[in-house]
Amino acid sequence: MRIALVTHKVDFQDGQGRVNYEIAKAALDRGHSVTVIAEYCSSEIANHPRGRFICAREIPIPTQLLRNIYFAEKSARWLRQHRDEFDIIQANGFVTWEPADIVAVHFVHSAWLRNPFFPFHWSSFSPYAYYQRLITIINGHYEKKAFRSADKLIAVSRFTAGEVAEYGISQEKLVVVHNGVDIEEFHPGPAVRSEFGLSEEIPLALFVGDIKTTRKNLETVLKAMQSVPELHLVVAGKVEGSPYPAIAEELKVSDRVHFIGKTSKIASLMRSVDFFVFPSRYEAHPLVLLEAMASGLPVVVSGNFGAADYIHAGGRVFDDPNDASALATIMEELVRFPEKRKSMGVAAREQALNMQWSQTAAGYLDVYEELLEKRRQSASAGHLSMDDVANSQEKK
C-alpha cells in the first residue's frame, strides 16, 4: 500500500505528531511505503528505505494563520501533481486544500467555538482575542469541507465523533480509533522527586499542559488548592508569558505551587506524584491523560473531555470545569485516602494497557485497508456490469 500522510508534524515528541509517527512506523513495519507531506518529519521515518519526506514549509512565516494557509496551498499543489502515486491519502483535520481519502479528527474547531467556555467571544475586543476567534472560525469553515469530501473520518474519541456528526456526516463514514500510549516509557515506579527539587514528604498533584491560555484550565485547579491546604501542585508547562504564577500569588497558594517549566522528563515526573489533575475546558483525546494512567496515577478530569468515557475506576470526572469546589472535594479525597488512591491508580494502569500504540496504529491501517478493499470491489462490480452489458448486446 502506498500511503501519503498530510500533517504539520510527524514527531515522536509532539501530540498529534506522535499519532502520525506511530501510524507511519507501523505502516513501514508492515512493508507499506509512506510519504509524509509536513513541516517536520522524524528522521526515522524520513530516512527509511520506504519513507519519503516532502517539506511543505521552507520559509519563515510570522503567524500561525499565515503558516497554515501557506501549508494548505503548498501541500495541495504537490498532491495534485502526485496524487496518482498513492493508494491512500490521509490528512489531519483541515491542513490542505486538496481533498483527502481519510481525515483524522483530533479537534473540532466549530465545536470549540460553540463551547460556553470558549474564551475569545465577541465581548472581548483585544487583538489577541480577535485573532484567536478568526483562526478558529477559519479552521471550522474549512474542516467542514475536509470532513465532507473525505471517504472516511477517523475520530479520536466517541465524544469527537459526536461533534463531527453534528455536521450532518453519515455514521457510516465515521470510525473511532483512540489514541495510544507507550506502556514501557510510562509505568509505575519509584519516585524521583529530588530530580525536580520536590520534597518527598508532601502530597503532590500534577498538571501538564499549555499555561499561556485558559483552555487547559489551570485557574480552577489553583482556586481549588485554596481549600486543600496540605496539597502541593507541580505544574509542567512553559512559564514565559503565562499569567498563572501571578494568579497563584493572588490566590495565596504560590508557596505550594511549583512551576517547573516545560520538561522532557514527563515519565519520571509522573512516577513522582500522587495523582494527575487536568480539568480542561475542551479536549478530544489528550495523550498526557493516557500517559498519566499508564504511570499508575489516578486522574481527575472535567466532563468536557473526549477521554472521560474510559476513565472508569481509574479516576474521577466532574461536570463543570469551572467548579472549583467540586474539584477541591475530589482532591481532598485523594489526599486523605492513600489506599483509595492506590486502587484507582491500579485501575488506571489496567485501562491504559488496553490502549497501546500498536492497537492505535493497527486501527488506522485497518481503515486504510478496508477502504482500499471497498474500492476494489466497486471497481470489480463496475467491470462485471460492463461485461454483462456487452454479452447481452452480443446475444441480441
Protein language model features and the residues they cover:
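A conserved mid-protein helix/loop that constitutes part of the nucleotide-sugar donor-binding site
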Residues: 17-22, 203, 207, 212-227
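A conserved nucleotide-sugar
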Residues: 33, 199-203, 218-258, 336-339
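A short, active-site helix/loop in glycosyltransferases that binds the activated sugar's phosphate group
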Residues: 144-173, 181-185
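A short helix/loop element that forms part of the nucleotide-sugar donor recognition site in Leloir-type
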Residues: 187-199, 340, 377, 381-384
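Aromatic "clamp/platform" in nucleotide-sugar-dependent glycosyltransferases that forms part
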Residues: 262, 281
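Short hydrophobic beta-strand element within catalytic cores of glycosyltransferases
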Residues: 298-301
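Conserved acidic donor-binding segment of nucleotide-sugar-dependent glycosyltransferases
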Residues: 313-324, 333-338
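A short, well-ordered alpha-helix in the C-terminal region of glycosyltransferases
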Residues: 333, 340-354, 363-366
